[in-house]
A protein has these predicted regions:
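Conserved acidic E/D residue at the C-terminus of a beta-strand in Rossmann-like folds
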Residues: 7-8, 163
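Active-site phosphate/pyrophosphate-binding segments
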Residues: 10, 20-149
Length: 168
């Protein structure tokens, strides 16, 4: 078994034990949420997967360049999100008294929901859980009551809600 460590800290136990190491260079984390380390590790995984696909020849012509260009455009997109302070403040003031929050997503968006829920509870101290969207009707929906905050994650336009879920 060959291992690749994706780490932020030079000399960490993973860096020492792995066969190869990718450093993210995120720097020290100030908050408990490890936002920089997580984001840079996600970018490293993306680059690694993209490069593996390029080397294996599984990307169509121009697709590799497009994927790397999209990653390079992230700082500008993050700046736009950060600039939307009024909307963020409006959401926070409207829902700050929520006792519970549920993050839901399907497919890759479920992974975003998991991390979003974790960040939300670590920083806001509001109870939060993440669920796969298709599983909401199998129990978790009974936990949703008046005042519960439900955050739906839908980042891929190719995801469509299935007919049974639409009526749940």
């Amino acid at each position: 078994v060959r291992t690749i460590g994706i780490v932020n800290v030079v000399g960490s136990s993973i860096a020492r034990e792995a066969d190869a190491t990718m450093y993210t260079w995120a720097g020290p984390e100030i908050s408990v949420a490890t936002t920089k380390a997580y984001s840079t590790q996600l970018a490293a995984c993306y680059l690694l997967a993209t490069e593996f696909a390029r080397v294996r020849g599984t990307l169509a012509d121009g697709q590799y360049e497009h994927l790397v260009t999209e990653l390079e455009a992230l700082p500008e997109k993050i700046e736009k999100t950060l600039a939307d302070k009024e909307r963020i403040q409006w959401f926070a003031s409207k829902y700050a008294n929520a006792k519970d929050a549920f993050f839901i997503g399907r497919g890759l968006d479920y992974a975003v929901a998991l991390e979003g829920s974790l960040k939300f509870k670590e920083i806001s101290y509001i109870h939060s859980e993440a669920f796969a969207a298709g599983e909401m009707k199998h129990g978790p929906i009974s936990l949703v009551e008046n005042g519960t905050l439900v955050v739906g994650i839908l980042t891929l336009s190719l995801i469509h809600i299935s007919e049974p879920t639409r009526h749940a």
